[in-house]
Amino acid sequence: MSLPASFDLTPEDAKLLLAANVHLGAKNVQVHNKPYVYKTRPDGMNIINIGKTWEKIVLAARIIAAVPNASDVAVCSSRTFGQRAVLKFAAHTGATAIAGRFTPGNFTNYITRSFKEPRLVVVTDPRTDAQAIKESSYVNIPVIALTDMDSPSEYVDVAIPCNNKGKHSIGLIWWLLAREVLRLRGIIPDRTTEWSVMPDLYFYRDPEEIEQNAVEEAKTEEVEEAPVAEAETEWTGETEDVDWADSGATPAAEDAAASNW
């Protein structure tokens, strides 16, 4: 049985996945993740089959697009590298973002102010977002997760095999997922039309690095705006010939010789 054309990985997307190191998996392999291993390197690192990664991205996007109300999809990331990505994903698709620490009882304790009743949960890492997955299992909410080769698969309904520890890998997977959701909703007309949003927008940025870059840019602007004083006259290394007899002036050496010491 052949898959639809949308499940075919394009060369451009394959280059993006490889450039972001999505294919670099962990050395340990959980039994349910074995079908996603393409090969094992001599150093023990497992290479993920990015073709299957793309198939799972398309499948997850179809599940997300099938939810009538976009805000009923909760996207979670306790991992620092994924917090910016889930916020951007929520902004572009209308989902509800839970970035940072997941408050226990968000899905089960209706007394809390942060209580939510999503119809679908998407998490960045089954280990760091274990509380969200556990509560989803209590209230029968399906879970989509970005899973590495060593990630646990309990209560995960759809696993997207990828490197869920690198900031570029996490950002790119969320970007591809958002783009596919927008394609299915018709916001992006067809697959030949490129999305105007760059993947860099989903990448984690270190606040200290941002401040340092801002300081360096300010210094560069100050140096460029400072006026450069130009010399009014240029010395050519040539001396002018002066006729001391006509001018009535005598050189300093002759004055010194004529004086009475």
Curated annotation (Swiss-Prot):
* UniProt record, GO biological process: cytoplasmic translation; ribosomal small subunit assembly; translation
Task: Quote the cellular component terms of the Gene Ontology held in the record.
Answer: cytosolic small ribosomal subunit; membrane; ribosome
Q: Which UniProt keywords apply?
A: Acetylation, Cytoplasm, Ribonucleoprotein, Ribosomal protein
Q: How does it assemble?
A: Component of the small ribosomal subunit. Mature ribosomes consist of a small (40S) and a large (60S) subunit. The 40S subunit contains about 33 different proteins and 1 molecule of RNA (18S). The 60S subunit contains about 49 different proteins and 3 molecules of RNA (25S, 5.8S and 5S). Interacts with RPS21.
Give the GO molecular function terms: structural constituent of ribosome
In the UniProt record, what gene is named as encoding this protein? RPS0
The family assignment reads: Belongs to the universal ribosomal protein uS2 family.
Subcellular localization, as worded in the UniProt entry: Cytoplasm
Sorted alphabetically, which SUPFAM superfamilies does this protein's record hold?
Ribosomal protein S2
Q: Which residues carry this modification: N-acetylserine?
A: 2
Please report the name of this protein according to its UniProt entry: Small ribosomal subunit protein uS2
For bias kind Acidic residues, which ranges apply? Answer: 222-244
Extra facts: This protein appears to have acquired a second function as a laminin receptor specifically in the vertebrate lineage. A 67 kDa form similar to the human laminin receptor (67LR) has been isolated from the cell walls of blastoconidia, but it does not bind laminin.
Q: What does this protein do?
A: Required for the assembly and/or stability of the 40S ribosomal subunit. Required for the processing of the 20S rRNA-precursor to mature 18S rRNA in a late step of the maturation of 40S ribosomal subunits.
One Pfam family here: Ribosomal_S2
Q: What is its main location?
A: cytoplasm
Q: Where is this region: Disordered?
A: 217-261
